[in-house]
Curated annotation (Swiss-Prot):
Protein name as annotated: Major capsid protein
Originating species: Helminthosporium victoriae virus-190S (Hv190SV)
Location of this chain's protein in the cell: Virion
Keyword ATP-binding included in the entry's annotation: no
Broad class of where this protein is predominantly found: virion
Domain of life according to the entry: Viruses
Length: 772
């Protein structure tokens, strides 16, 4: 199965690389990402610049440990996959040419070779004397040539066929590094032709020096990438490469528990490699070529992969559902034997808590590995089937040791390794974590604008001095208002006051000296900054920072303060008429190398304990795992009043009447279906025919008459004394007078009107006269 590479996502991750080999455990390669945010205050743009720091150290202190082979009791996991049918036919052709070669290539397993190549590349960025021989980790090199070997060659178990044509004018050292990596994984190399020593009959494989090894490894990785992509195993290739990088390097996490993913990637190993490597496939370009062989260039190349694969963890967080809302994945390591504390209190972690968190993590790990491996495939531009990679990593993760230090906490939100802003686009996967605002804010060299709050509604009246709002903020990370004002030199957050908050619904608040419990902070009318963590390498809140299960906040903003003399002092906040419509614009650069040095990572002092909120959120996770849905009929314990019930119109039966009636408010005010006063009456029964009729206010139209009408209306007035009589109804020689004009303004002539109502015709009057 072939896939077209659309973009090279890993190209140019780091700008201006500095630093090379890491000489001590206290030395870290450091990078700085510049972030600019802006908002409108008083009609003027307010801008500030901050930085995100990333640090990368070494996980081992010698190259021998970095490239050590798996022991006899190492937990290895088989990760074989079906080989592409076209490649199978090509490899089987060798069995027809060489009778001593019994080939079966229906399945292949090259992920272990990819992981060792990645470990060698990472070791080249840490140590300065890595050669191709070091890649096999003191294992013997076994190479069989089909043309010169006089015994049978079996490829069913642990043999990898590597043709000599993997070398060309540009990639002349690929064969050497591939042979040593296969040997380091315990496999045997089979090739078409090779030079043997005349005296010892040992194969002669060239040795590549420290300057040539990094480039040769990258070329070999691109070759294996094209082979595994051809068999629809691009995600497995990306996972194996990621595991190899993080087994040698150590990316410093931005949260206490975020490094647990690094520990999981170091668990287990791949089984013995077997299969064949084809040299004639389309070149894989998802992994950039290494342009320079300097130590700084190699370090920047490897660190770019390490940072991207660590940052995308936040985008793959499967999350929890609580009361219809999405929250980051959360594990509670306490039990009923632990004391229930208030939000804001802190409890020291224990080994028992670490083991309980570990059990929960492994029980739900598949929900994380599925999107994470998909994300790795997108990073390396290697789409394909993720089932083999997912099954392998789920099995390998069970070798995670007991009492992991990253889980030795009362509660953890594990899937936030480092700040992804500047490394990953905000919509990279289309995951729920991205939609809810817990992933990256913005990608490198781009600009993005968002509302300052997810939802904000004015509470009461406002003026130019104070304004209060009901704000929706399920976590500190979802509020872009904090992305701009948190750590701002003008300290605008000091003019905020948290007035309404349910302390029992708050998770992972920050420290506050003198008011440790969240309840006391609300009563003390403290600003929003006293609820947040201490800032370290990232200026932005973490995904698990200051979670609120109700998502509701009542915050008072002081726009102006006055001195004792009446002088006003404008606060660094949007004006009262601007607050509800405030937006924040963010522009992010790419990581820039700075001088290596000691780590500046500090303790964020997050307050963790067994609280009502931690029990509720962790219970939702367990209910979802057991029953398939997180909802439960039990009402959570909160100290805030429920939402007000909307008022409904009064029932007609409660209106009027005499005094003394009982009209309880607890009764239902709406009539039952079918009642005459039911507001939604429905038609029913057999339809009736249409019948013309006259209602009580209408009558058949009668023609109007001339002269007086009955009832005293329209009586002609008598002529004045000495005046001439009135003229006849019509002119002497003209037609009789017509009816009055139509009331509706119509110009159509009306029908003739008789002179009197029920007047007999002229012929009938003549007959009557003759009869008399």
């Amino acid at each position: 199965m072939s896939h077209t590479t659309i973009t090279n996502f890993l190209a140019g991750v780091i700008a201006r690389p500095q630093g090379g080999n890491i000489t001590s455990d206290e030395t870290f390669r450091r990078y700085r990402t510049i972030v600019r945010t802006s908002a409108t205050i008083g009609g003027n743009e307010d801008s500030r610049t901050t930085s995100i720091f990333h640090e990368i150290g070494r996980a081992v202190n010698t190259k021998g440990k970095a490239l050590a082979v798996a022991g006899m009791e190492a937990p290895l996991v088989e990760a074989s996959y079906p080989t592409n049918a076209v490649l199978v036919e090509d490899f089987i052709g060798l069995a027809k040419k060489y009778t001593n070669f019994s080939a079966t290539f229906e399945y292949s397993s090259l992920a272990g070779v990819v992981e060792r190549l990645a470990r060698g590349l990472a070791a080249c960025s840490v140590f300065e004397d890595v050669t191709s021989t070091d890649l096999r980790g003191n294992n013997p090199l076994a190479v069989h040539a089909l043309a010169t070997y006089d015994g049978p060659v079996n490829s069913l178990t642990s043999a990898v066929f590597i043709p000599r044509l993997v070398n060309n004018a540009l990639t002349g050292d690929v064969f050497a590094v591939l042979c040593n990596c296969v040997a380091g994984e315990g496999g045997t190399v089979v090739t078409d032709t090779i030079e043997l020593d005349a005296n010892t009959r040992q194969p002669i494989v060239p040795e590549v020096g420290p300057l040539g090894v990094p480039g040769a490894i990258v070329d070999a990785l691109r070759l294996l990438g094209s082979n595994m992509i051809a068999s629809d195993q691009g995600p497995l290739f990306a996972l194996a490469l990621t595991r190899g990088i993080h087994r040698v390097l150590s990316v410093v996490g931005h949260t206490d528990e975020g490094g647990i993913v690094r520990d999981l990637l170091r668990c287990g190993g791949f089984g013995l490699p077997f299969g064949g490597i084809h040299y004639g496939l389309e070149e894989y370009s998802g992994l950039p070529a290494l342009q320079f062989n300097s130590a700084a260039a190699t370090a920047a190349y490897v660190d770019g992969i390490a940072l991207v694969t660590a940052a995308v963890v936040a985008h793959a967080d499967p999350g929890e559902r609580y009361n219809g809302e999405w929250f980051p994945t959360f594990f509670d390591g306490t039990t009923h034997a632990d004391t229930m504390r208030r939000s804001g209190d802190s409890t020291e972690g224990t080994a028992a808590m670490a083991d309980r968190n570990r059990a929960q993590l492994l029980a739900r790990q598949q929900l994380f590995w599925r999107p994470y491996i998909t994300a790795l495939g997108a990073c390396f531009s290697t789409a394909g089937d993720i089932s083999v990679a997912e099954r392998f990593q789920c099995a390998a993760s069970h070798s995670l040791g007991a009492d992991p230090r990253h889980l030795r906490l009362p509660s953890v939100a594990p899937y936030f390794w480092i700040e992804p802003t500047g490394l990953i686009p905000h919509d990279f996967l289309g995951s729920v974590a991205e939609e809810e605002g817990f992933a990256s804010y913005c990608w490198r060299d781009t600009t993005r604008t968002r509302p300052a709050w997810d939802s904000i509604v004015l509470s009461g009246a406002r003026d130019t001095t104070f304004s209060a709002y009901h704000i929706r903020m399920k976590g500190a990370r979802t509020a872009w208002f904090l992305a701009h004002w948190l750590g701002h030199p003008e300290n605008g957050l000091g003019a905020t006051r948290v007035r309404q908050l349910d302390p029992n619904a708050v998770l992972h608040p920050g420290p506050c000296e003198g008011n440790e419990q969240v309840r006391d902070r609300v009563e003390a009318d403290l600003p929003l900054t006293d609820y947040l963590w201490r800032r370290g390498q990232s200026p932005f809140p973490a995904a698990g920072e200051l979670l609120n299960l109700t998502s509701e906040w009542g915050i008072l903003f002081r726009h102006v303060t006055f001195t004792d003399d009446g002088d006003l002092n404008p606060e660094h906040l949007p004006a009262a008429h601007e607050m509800a419509d405030t937006t924040v614009t963010m522009t992010v650069g790419r990581p820039i190398g700075i001088a290596p040095g000691r780590s500046n990572a500090g303790d964020n002092q997050a307050r963790r304990a067994r609280t009502r909120a931690s029990v509720e959120l962790s219970a939702a996770s367990r209910r979802a795992r057991v029953f398939g849905r997180p909802d439960v009929g039990e009402m959570p314990t909160l100290t805030s009043a429920p939402a007000p019930i909307p008022a409904s119109p009064a029932y007609d039966g409660n209106r009027g009447g005499e005094a003394g009636g009982v009209t309880g408010r607890g009764n239902n005010r709406s009539a039952a279906p079918g009642h005459a006063s039911w507001s939604e009456r429905q038609a029913d029964g057999v339809p009736v025919n249409v019948t013309p009729h006259h209602n009580a206010l209408r009558a058949p139209p009668f023609p109007r008459q001339q002269g007086a009408l009955g009832g005293g209306g329209n009586v002609p007035l008598p002529p004045a004394p000495g005046a001439a009589p009135p003229p006849p109804p019509g002119p002497p020689n003209g037609p009789p007078a017509g009816p009055p004009p139509s009331d509706d303004g119509s110009s159509n002539p009306a029908a003739p009107v008789p002179t009197a109502i029920h007047a007999p015709p002229a012929a009938a009057q003549a007959d009557r006269a003759e009869g008399q």
